[in-house]
Amino acid sequence: MSYAQNNLGWMYRNGNGVAQDYTLAFFWYKQAALQGHSYAQDNLADLYKDGEGVAQNKTLAAFWYLKSAQQGNRHAQFQIAWDYNAGEGVDQDYKQAMYWYLKAAAQESVGAYVNIGYMYKHGQGVEKDYQAAFEWFTKAAECNDATAWYNLAIMYHYGEGRPVDLRQALDLYRKVQSSGTRDVSQEIRETEALL
C-alpha cells in the first residue's frame, strides 16, 4: 500500500498522468511515510524543505530525512548530512554531518565525496587533513564532478598538502570552465600569468 501511495505522491508532484498538485503530493507522501516507506519519507522531507504543498518547515524536513536515512536512503543520508553541516532544521553538528556523508559515500554519492573532502580540508568534524581531502576530491573528480575539479585545482594552485603544480591547476581550471558550472576565467588568467 505504501508503495502505491508514494507513487501517487510522485505523480502529483511531477504532474505525471495527473494535474500537478503539491497538496495532493504531500498528502500521499505523508500516508506512505507514516507507514515507514523510506522513499516517501525522503520525498516528504523535500516538500517540507521547499515549502511545496505545505508550509516550509526545515525542522520537519530534517526529521523525515533522518527517518529515511536511517533506513539506508542515500539521498536522505546526503540531505541530513547537509542539514547537520549547515545547521538547517537541526543544531549544527559537524561530526553528525561527517557520519551521514560517509554513509552516503558508501553508496557512491558523488556529492558526499566532495563534501567529505571539503570537511577534511577545513577540519570540520575531523582533524584537518589535506591528503584525505585530496583523496575524496579525486574520487569525485573521477566521476566528472566539476566542484571536485575546482577544489583539486585550488589544492594544486596553492600547494595545499602537495607541491604547487600550476600546470595541473590550470588543466583543472579549464575543465571547470568547459563544464559551464562556474566561471573560473579569473583563476585561469592568474594561473597562466604565473607560468
Where are these regions (language model features)?
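TPR/TPR-like alpha-solenoid signature
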Residues: 6, 27, 42, 63, ...
